[in-house]
Structure formats: C-alpha cells, structure tokens
Amino acid sequence: MLNKDQFADNHFIRTIIEEDLESGKHTAVQTRFPPEPNGYLHIGHAKSICLNFGLAYIYDGLCNLRFDDTNPEKENDEYVNAIKEDVEWLGFHWAGEPRFASNYFDQLYDYAVGLIKDGKAYVDDLTPEEMREYRGTLTEAGKNSPYRDRSVEENLDLFTRMKNGEFPDGSKTLRLKIDMASGNINMRDPVIYRIRRAHHHNTGDKWCIYPMYDYTHCISDAIEGITHSLCTLEFEAHRPLYDCVLDNIPAPHATRPRQYEFSRLELLYTITSKRKLNQLVVEKHVSGWDDPRMPTISGMRRRGYTPEGLRLFAKRAGISKSENIVDMSVLEGAIREELENSAPRLMAVLNPLKVTLTNFETGRTQSRRAAFHPNHEEMGEREVPISQTIYIEADDFAENPPKGFKRLIPGGEVRLRHGYVIKCDEVVKDEAGNVVELKCSIDHDTLGKNPEGRKVKGVIHWVSAEHAAEIKVRLYDRLFTVERPDAVRGEDGEYLPFTDFLNPESVKEITAYAEPAAKDLPAESRWQFERIGYFVTDRKDHGKDTPVFNRTVTLKDSWQPK
C-alpha cells in the first residue's frame, strides 16, 4: 500500500511542481516513465520509477508508462512485458494503457514533412564518417553539409522516397537545419530520421525509416500532455534541442512540456550499464537477467528484496543535481529495515553440528508454540518440535572460546531458542580430531523460564533432527569486489575489464536444515532465519520436494572487501 511519506522529501523538482500548481501554470501534474525496451530494468530505473510515479501520486496527478521504441534491432516484446511486470511489482499503476513512441510514428512523420516545408529540415547524403568530420569539436565550429541548401521540393521528394524504401540503409538522413556553429554540439543540425530496414516489435515492417530519440521524445511528451519531463543529467545539454523541436511544430496539446534533469544514481559494487549487464548474461558469469546477484529489478526481486524496501531506498538516495554515489550498504540497510518488520521468523541451521540430549527420552517428541514475529501477533504461531537429537550451528560451539564468547562451551550452559537450557557434558571427535557430536543434558525446569540460582547469557537457534526440513540454501553476496568495477585503470592508464573484478564468492550453495514449517512454503515467501539473516524461497526453483532459499541480506552489514 502506497502512502505519501514513502517518497523523497522536499527536493527541487517538488518545489518546481508546487510553484507551477500555485501559479496556475498547470492545473494538474502529468509525468511519464519512458524506458527503452532493450533490456531489463535495474536499480537506477527503480529510482526514476519512484520519482515519476511518486510525484504523480503525491500531487494527485497521472503518470504514463511509455516505451521509447525507436531502435527496432534492440527492442522486443520480452523486454516490454518484463518492464510492465517490474513497474507493477514495485507497486505502481500507469494511466490508461501503456504508450509506445511507435504509436506516434505517423504523427512524427507528418511533423517532419512540415519542418521540411518550412525550410527547417533537409535530406543529407553525408556518410556517418563525413558527418563526424563536418560536425566539428567542442572548440571548433562545424561546417555546413554540401546538401544543406537543397530546395524544399527536392527534400520533400527525397524524404518521401526514403519512406518508400528507394534508398539503401544508412545512405541518407533527415537533419534539422539549426546552426553548425552552435556551442552546443547537439544543436549542429542533428539527425532526426535514418533509413533502417528492421522488423519492429510493434509496427512490424511498415517503416524503413525511424525517428531519432531526441526528436521523438519531446514530441511524445507533448502529444501526451506531459507537464514535467524528468530525466538524468546527461540530457541537460539536449534540453535546447528538446525545446527547439517543440518551438517549430504545431502544438499537439494545450500543455507544453518542460524538461528537468536530476543526477543519475551510481550504486557502488555493481554496474548498471545495459551493455555490460548483457555481457554478464551472454558470457554466463550469471544465470540470466534475473540472477539474484544482478542489479536488475527482476534479479533483486528473486533475491528477496521487497517493493517497500526499494521504495525506501529510493527515498534515502534522494533527488538532486549533485553527484548521487550511494554505497551498497544503504540499499541493503533499507531492505534489512523493511524485512525486520515484515518477515516472519523461522529457525534454520546452515552448518549443522549434531547434539544428543542424553536425558531426553528416546523416541519422545515435545513441541512448543512460538510466534512467527515478536511484534506482530497477527502473523500467528507455529509448532516447534524437539526430540533427542538436534542440530545447532557449528559456530555456536567452541572448545577454546575467545574472550566474550557467550555460546556453548565444554561444561557450559546455553539456552535453546524457544526451548530448554542445555549443558555440554561431552565432546565427541572423529579420528582427525574434528568435533562431530556434543552430548548435552537439558534442565527440565527451564522451559519458558530462567534456571534457579544461575544466569544463562547465551541463546542459540537449533532444529530437531527428526523433524527438520532439508533445504537448499544459496548464500549470495556482492557480485564485484571493488566499488567501481568498470572504472579501474591498469598501469598503462587503460581501463581494465570489469569482469576482472567479479567476486568468486558471490554465491555458495549448501544443504541446510530448517524447522518443519519450511516444508510447505510458496515461492517468493520471505523469512528471517533467526540469528542468520533474511531469506526468500526462490521464485523459479523452489518446490515442495526441493525447497530452495536465497539469502537476501544478512542480519548485519558484515561485508569486507576481498
């Protein structure tokens, strides 16, 4: 359930919106989230989703979902469907049906014809190499194309023939006629159409010319009546072109959109480049786009992150124009905080050590009811059985304990969570000297109460060996060992391959044992394994016969760079 407190506090975009509403410039807020369907959404997109949909929610406006699908070779329906699923999973709903820039191709073409008729666009025959040469540099003005002064009639004829498929791919472009000497390179006669014979996921083979992003985006905003078009800072230099296009076409809507920029999220210890994420998938460094180590929304969902936790992270990351570098611990902290409140508890033992309770009757089973959550009675209770043989964590026993060790030691006592106080009477070892079993006695008078005359400080978790569910546990950790894996230079000053910094210990699969309540859980069921961390049943591989749990995050931030 959304509420207005879940979104970023007052920031400069909210100030702009409130001033626009107060002045009457706009009577309602209309935003949009405009992904290109050429990959899966990642954590950076989650921030943008929360911003655009969140602002619409806060100010009782609307937010469109629009697919900027102008690159047919890279886009497909798989990505479209995945994006829609991710947005809905995050808790948001778009206004009306999803939009596609490709739905506006006819209008975009008509506007281009109008620009030609007004002498503001021309067909160019320069090759890409020649165009780069004519474009100039940041310190040197560009040169006019020799085709810049074609007549309106010739340009209309050539553009029509481009549309009809009479010319080879890449042989001609349509360019805006602006200023080749502009200090902003984006304003040096930018290309707005190119010839590209490619099947389009939405329009099929209807078109062999496709509009460019800078031309399409602003017109799509205008058609949809967007009031505040929000994008990341790398588009700041494109804003003059955004305004220029809209200044030179008939207004498609009474509302004129305005572009505003905010800083891109940079999350440490990961990457968000779609190209590099795709490389990880193609080269099989990960199992797919939804691998729980990936920063994709589908990967984080499979890892066990919650929509509420991601919205909390987006709020804490904030919105500004300054550099937005955020440590992974901030993301993990937000997830941990949300799960602390929402995840029911179970006990599980990841590294089992056998314990025989010598004074517990052989063949007898006793059980005690325990709450699923200490602060949420509504989550109910479960039966926790105990039998003569139990498993505890091997780390919860030490023959030669370090200072301050409060768990089980030879001759020492510890309380079993939800159970008795036990005392270690004997340590059993194998031929190699490894501890393989503890023989302990229970204090029968300590079930649910403290022992008389002594204080037992340590409390450990455990499971009944007879009743435990055998589970598969995947212990996930950070995918990379350095903060910026794609920004490390070698001795020669060149960037090193980001794959050099993959964490070889980013996943480890083990067999563990959990309370019997773990046997019949549905997929995507999130739990706290007491004293260990937060886990989720895998949404793909989990089943009744083969329970699979993914570690979402540890109870505390224990990351140490490798």
UniProtKB/Swiss-Prot annotation:
Q: Motif ('HIGH' region) spans which residues?
A: 35-45
The record ties this protein, via HAMAP family, to: Gln_tRNA_synth
Protein name according to UniProt: Glutamine--tRNA ligase
GO cellular component annotations, sorted alphabetically?
A: cytosol
- Residues bound to ATP are 36-38, 42-48, 232, 264-265
The organism that produces this protein has a lineage beginning with: Bacteria, Pseudomonadati, Pseudomonadota, Betaproteobacteria, Neisseriales
What's the encoding gene here? glnS
- Predominantly, its location class is cytoplasm
Q: Name one GO biological process term.
A: glutaminyl-tRNA aminoacylation
One GO term in the molecular function aspect is: glutamine-tRNA ligase activity
Q: Detail which positions bind L-glutamine.
A: 68, 213
Swiss-Prot/TrEMBL catalytic activity: tRNA(Gln) + L-glutamine + ATP = L-glutaminyl-tRNA(Gln) + AMP + diphosphate
Keyword Disulfide bond: yes or no? no
